[in-house]
Amino acid sequence: MANYVYTIFLDAGHGGSDPGAVYKGRQEKDDTLALTLAVGEILESYGFRVIYSRTEDIYESPYQKAAKANASGAD
């Protein structure tokens, strides 16, 4: 039986100048990044290859993220 390794592309959403929803100083961009990194870590521990749209507080347009995802070779 073949041992398949899957590549997963995770998009944290928002970032940089786009905070997403904001409530009492809490910004959605921070929550989405933390959650994406945590999920990615779990997936990596199971042997998946994970590619992230961002790992720090930067902004990329939806078009840029889609192009990055399409070029990543993710399954």
Region spans (language model):
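Catalytic-core regions of hydrolytic enzymes
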Residues: 2-75
